[in-house]
């Protein structure tokens, strides 16, 4: 029994990760990570969540829900910034927890993140499909139900657009990081300009009476809390999924130029931009129309613009937002493929996944992520996916918060002293852990249940395969493909 516990508690030598990941090309700069982060965080959710949360939970105080969620996300981002600067390894939280707590806990954290990437890829692709179909429907272009809805939903068999957009994104990423980064930078600029356009035009249509009362009176319906601080809290748990994309930056830190400076600037900079955009959109949206009018509205931004007489602006914003969803797919598929590569690198999943092609890209891992993303995105409905995204990620965030205490003890020894340091240590990591736990507790019962099932599957997989095939403390020798 002692041997078993010693095995699962084995910690990876950071020097070995440095050697294994040294074959990945370091090409990404601060501007690339800013684009990657903003593009991933500011995805489908900025055009949908403000209206949904306002109508279902918080009313005009949806802006407070976004602000409180941003505070929690910001605290996690501070821990991520120091971790990524000290340990710029592929796989982010998985690799960090592996080094600091041991293999089993690293696997649990990584398995939690893998759920995020699988579901987020499918979620964004499903949202892309819904928005694109809504955009072209007024001009008479409409797919048959069998090809436009997930299996078993409204007569659907497969969401073909969701499948195609995932395949196209995978094709782009398979060609190299430089091409993907250039595309990401252009699309993010377009997306931010579209959001700014909505805010400017929306300001001209604000009715101040829509903000009163700013925090509606609390009431409990059959399924949700609405109004009061209870409604704001319920909104925080739902909104938090909007901010989790900054992990995609850390997952690619092994490909960063000068990660000591690049990683903190990319993580904190992209989250700061996203917070400003989210709160601005939320405030303008609930000011344009009474929050109750956004109930069951899948495209509140476009609807509000059309109803206020700005149909042309609505078409422009929606068209750019649809194109801009590629940015979130790029970010999530990059991060997910690097996490699968990390599992293969360490033997916890088949080592086939860690193979690098002649461009030093883990395209085999990308292929697996693509196949699973296509299956989930084209077969499961948008609403089902939305509730599952943040649960696993929150578990990984709790691990990272606690790992700060282990990291500080090893900085200057077998780990470098990073250029960026988390402020208010040792208080802030504990506060971060408690706040993330509160956000997790506010998730719905189904999300927690599915998360538990996912972890049970992960533990079974680790005990049956990963534990026996682990390459812990094995120095990797890289053999270029022939």
Task: Give the role of each language-model region.
Residues 154-157, 352-363, 397-448, 468-481:
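C-terminal membrane-solvent junction of multi-pass transporters and transport-like membrane proteins
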Residues 95-96, 101-102, 133-141, 145, ...:
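TM-loop-TM module centered on a large, flexible mid-protein loop between adjacent transmembrane helices
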Residues 129, 157-208, 267, 271, ...:
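Membrane-interface loop-to-helix entry segments
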Residues 28-47, 159-169, 205, 221-276, ...:
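Hydrophobic, membrane-embedded alpha-helices of multi-pass small-molecule transporters
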Residues 54-58, 62, 126-130, 145-154, ...:
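Transmembrane helix-loop boundary segments of multi-pass membrane transporters
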Residues 2, 130-138, 189-218, 283-289, ...:
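Hydrophobic alpha-helical segments and their helix-loop junctions in multi-pass secondary transporters
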Residues 54, 64-65, 74-166, 171, ...:
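Hydrophobic transmembrane alpha-helices that form the core helical bundles
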């Amino acid at each position: 029994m002692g041997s078993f516990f010693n095995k699962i508690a084995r910690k990876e030598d950071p020097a070995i990760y440095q050697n294994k990941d040294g074959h990945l090309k370091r090409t990404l700069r601060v501007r690339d990570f800013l684009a990657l982060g903003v593009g991933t965080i500011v995805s489908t959710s900025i055009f949908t969540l403000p209206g949904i949360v306002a109508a279902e939970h918080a009313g005009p105080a949806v802006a407070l829900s976004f602000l409180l969620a941003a505070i929690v996300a910001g605290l996690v981002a501070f821990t991520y910034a120091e971790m990524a600067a000290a340990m710029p390894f592929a796989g982010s939280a998985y690799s960090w927890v592996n080094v600091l707590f041991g293999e089993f806990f690293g696997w649990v954290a990584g398995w939690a993140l893998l759920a995020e990437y699988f579901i987020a890829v499918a979620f964004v692709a499903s949202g892309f499909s819904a928005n694109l179909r809504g955009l072209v429907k007024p001009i008479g272009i409409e797919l048959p139900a069998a090809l436009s809805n997930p299996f078993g939903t409204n007569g659907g068999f497969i969401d073909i657009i969701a499948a195609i957009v995932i395949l196209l994104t995978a094709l782009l990423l398979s060609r190299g990081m430089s091409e993907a980064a250039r595309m990401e930078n252009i699309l993010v600029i377009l997306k931010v300009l579209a959001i700014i356009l909505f805010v400017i035009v929306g300001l001209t249509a604000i009715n101040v009476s829509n903000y009163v009362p700013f925090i509606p009176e609390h009431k409990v319906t059959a399924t949700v809390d609405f109004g009061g601080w209870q409604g704001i809290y319920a909104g925080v748990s739902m909104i938090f999924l909007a901010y989790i994309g900054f992990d995609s930056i850390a997952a690619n830190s092994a490909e960063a130029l000068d990660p000591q400076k690049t990683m903190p600037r990319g993580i904190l900079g992209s989250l700061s931009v996203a917070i400003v955009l989210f709160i601005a959109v939320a405030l303008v949206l609930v000011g344009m129309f009474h929050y109750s009018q956004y109930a069951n509205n899948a495209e509140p931004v476009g609807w509000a613009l059309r109803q206020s007489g700005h149909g042309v602006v609505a078409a422009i914003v929606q068209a750019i937002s649809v194109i801009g969803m590629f940015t979130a797919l790029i970010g999530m598929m990059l991060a997910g493929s690097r996490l699968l590569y990390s599992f293969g690198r360490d033997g916890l999943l088949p080592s086939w996944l860690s193979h690098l092609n002649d461009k030093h890209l883990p395209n085999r891992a990308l292929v697996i992520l693509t196949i699973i993303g296509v299956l989930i995105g084209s077969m499961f409905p948008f609403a089902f996916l939305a509730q599952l995204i943040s649960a696993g990620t929150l578990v990984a965030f709790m691990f990272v918060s606690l790992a700060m205490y282990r990291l500080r003890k090893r900085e200057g020894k077998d780990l470098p002293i990073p250029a960026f340091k988390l402020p208010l240590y040792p208080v802030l990591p504990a506060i971060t852990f408690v706040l993330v736990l509160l956000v997790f507790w506010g998730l719905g019962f189904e999300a927690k249940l599915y998360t538990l099932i996912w972890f049970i599957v992960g533990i079974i997989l680790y005990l049956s395969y990963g534990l026996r095939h682990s390459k812990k403390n094995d120095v990797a020798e890289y053999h270029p493909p022939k």
